[in-house]
Regions:
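A short, hydrophobic C-terminal helix/tail in secreted or cell-surface proteins
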Residues: 234-242
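Sequence/fold signature of self-assembling virion shell proteins
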Residues: 70-94, 114-231, 235
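Residues immediately flanking
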Residues: 14-16, 113
Length: 242
């Protein structure tokens, strides 16, 4: 398996006038904003690679009497295609059948807050404060369903293009086993925080400073069978306008 390695980064200028007149420490404030940008950028790169996986479960259409109709594409989803515990039990069964190792003691699902909202109303869902040992939870973890632990993030994949039903968005929830994917750990190419003080470089009047970051990243799916992409449909217009 090969992958192309790319460099990413961002920066913001800080003038001498701003630093003289502002109440806040602008270097600290800029660092906080850019740190968030750096993390979300790297997460998004990995997310988009994983969201291209081929091991997919589509939420079925549900009729008024509870009859299910299979769905085989994002375009075919409708308002009745909602997130249910059954989808995740199916995903866990697939991973188990493929001998996918858990991450710790469970598989891990990456879920958007709007999708998690639907899941939290299910009686089978166990919230983190009910864990026997809540100290072992991951950052962003919201609960557990069977042997799947859920990590909530606004960076979870959302489709709103021509492959989706008109006027509606499709949310993707990833269910992962160990060794499903890999990312780069390049020596000397990790995230770097860069601060340039006033007068650095071509700045004869000491007017320009800057704060920035850069880093290298590549991500690849390693074993398709060790990850499942569950596609769900969210119908509220406010959710489509994200």
């Amino acid at each position: 398996i090969t992958s192309d390695l790319h460099q990413y980064g961002g920066w913001t200028p800080l003038t001498d006038v701003l630093q003289m007149t502002a109440i806040d420490n602008n270097v600290v404030q800029a660092t906080r904003v850019l740190a968030s940008q750096a993390g979300r950028t790297m997460d998004s790169i990995t997310r988009d690679v994983l969201a291209g996986g081929t091991n997919v479960i589509y939420a079925p259409k549900l009729s008024a009497d509870g009859t299910e109709t299979a769905v085989t594409s994002r375009k075919a989803l409708d308002k009745s295609c909602t997130l249910t515990p059954k989808l995740f039990f199916q995903a866990a069964a697939q991973l188990g059948a493929m001998n996918a190792d858990p991450i710790g003691d469970s598989y891990i699902a990456i879920i958007h807050p709007y999708a998690a909202y639907d899941l939290k109303t299910c009686k089978e869902f166990m919230e983190v404060h009910k864990y026997a040992d809540p100290d072992t939870m991951f950052r962003g973890e919201i609960g557990k369903l069977g042997n799947i632990r859920f990590i909530e993030t606004s960076e979870a994949k959302i489709w709103k293009d021509d492959t989706c039903p008109a006027g509606l968005a499709v949310f993707g929830t990833l269910v992962l086993g160990a060794h499903a994917y890999g990312v780069t750990e390049l020596e000397g190419g990790g995230l770097e925080h860069i601060v340039k003080q006033l007068g650095y470089g071509d700045d004869p009047l000491n007017q320009r400073a800057s704060v920035g970051w850069k880093g290298m990243r590549a991500a690849e799916r390693l074993v398709e069978q060790y990850m499942v992409l569950s596609l769900i449909h969210i119908s509220e217009p406010t959710r489509h306008s994200l």
